[in-house]
UniProtKB/Swiss-Prot annotation:
Phosphoprotein listed as a keyword: yes
GO molecular-function terms, A-Z: glutamate-cysteine ligase activity; glutamate-cysteine ligase catalytic subunit binding; protein-containing complex binding
Keywords, comma-separated and alphabetical: Acetylation, Glutathione biosynthesis, Phosphoprotein
Protein name according to UniProt: Glutamate--cysteine ligase regulatory subunit
InterPro entries linked to this entry: Gclm (IPR032963), NADP_OxRdtase_dom (IPR023210), NADP_OxRdtase_dom_sf (IPR036812)
Lineage: Eukaryota, Metazoa, Chordata, Craniata, Vertebrata
SUPFAM superfamilies the record matches: NAD(P)-linked oxidoreductase (SSF51430)
Modified residues (N6-acetyllysine): 263
Subunit structure as annotated in this protein's UniProt entry: Heterodimer of a catalytic heavy chain and a regulatory light chain.
Pathway: Sulfur metabolism; glutathione biosynthesis; glutathione from L-cysteine and L-glutamate: step 1/2
Sites bearing Phosphoserine, chain numbering: 59
């Protein structure tokens, strides 16, 4: 892997942006870890294997070009939705903002997901709570810039429905009253509450908000874990220079049968100072 790693390291030393996409994990076959114990473990494994695959297939032309934006893809697993089957599929995504960057990440994540899957719009996007400093309670002000961008995407028909994650009754009520496009769902982590809070259930029922459950950790991808995965896959690199900005996890479900046809991750990272 030495030569591959050196070529990948040289490209990453010059580029400013990294786009990583796993393709459809159901197409990975034996590459995929059979039973990842957590979502974080699955994600880290996916990042490393995608980096390994990409670095092993770098062409001499790419090294000569030194592109500013690197497209790191598990090429054999890429799978676009057949336009003839689009109406039969539900395309859902959950967006995790990782870096302390602007809300424009929301648009770039949705645009990239549509491009990767070959669709004009996503049926549903749930926004994980944005990162905040330790000891600070999540407020409406934290959510507003991201929600406004999601609203713009609904109005421009890039998304059909938008939802939230891990909001309590007060937070959900504040967002609902302020928002132009109302949340149609709110995910609740059952690790933190075995039973749905009655006040949240009552509010959601009153305003027709679907309550869903999830088991994502509070921090699915940290800056440190991304840099460790990068360093392990490509030793010839200053991994600490790279910061993940956002992560999007998508799933494509056959509506009539409830079967997952495709699922994967898309990620964007930036090099500091670039």
């Amino acid at each position: 892997m030495g030569t591959d790693s050196r070529a990948a390291g040289a490209l990453l030393a010059r580029a400013s942006t990294l786009h990583l996409q796993t393709g459809n994990l159901l197409n990975w076959g034996r590459l995929r870890k059979k039973c990842p114990s957590t979502h974080s473990e699955e994600l880290r494994d996916c990042i490393q294997k995608t980096l390994n695959e990409w670095s092993s297939q770098i062409s001499p032309d790419l090294v000569r070009e030194f592109p500013d934006v690197l497209e790191c893809t598990m090429s054999h697993a890429v799978e676009k939705i057949n336009p003839d089957e689009r109406e039969e599929m539900k395309v859902s995504a959950k967006l995790f903002i990782v870096g302390s960057n602007s809300s424009s990440s929301t648009r770039s994540a949705v645009d990239m997901a549509c491009s990767v899957l070959g669709v004009a719009q996503l049926d549903s996007v749930i926004m994980a709570s944005p990162p905040i400093e330790d000891g600070v309670n999540l407020s409406l002000e934290h959510l507003q810039p991201y929600w406004e961008e999601l609203e713009n995407l609904v109005q421009s028909k890039k998304i059909v429905a938008i939802g939230t994650s891990d909001l309590d009754k007060t937070q959900l009520e504040q967002l609902y009253q302020w928002a132009q496009v109302k949340p149609n769902s709110n995910q609740v982590n059952l690790a933190s509450c075995c039973v749905m809070p009655p006040d949240l259930t009552a509010f959601a029922k009153q305003f027709d908000i679907q309550l869903l459950t999830h088991n994502d950790p509070k921090e699915l991808l940290s800056e440190a874990s991304f840099q460790e995965a990068l360093q392990e896959s490509i030793p010839d690199i200053e991994a600490q220079d790279w910061v993940p900005l956002w992560l999007l996890r998508y799933s494509v479900i056959v509506k009539s049968r409830g079967i997952i046809k495709s699922k994967g991750y898309i990620l964007q990272a930036k090099r500091r100072g670039s």
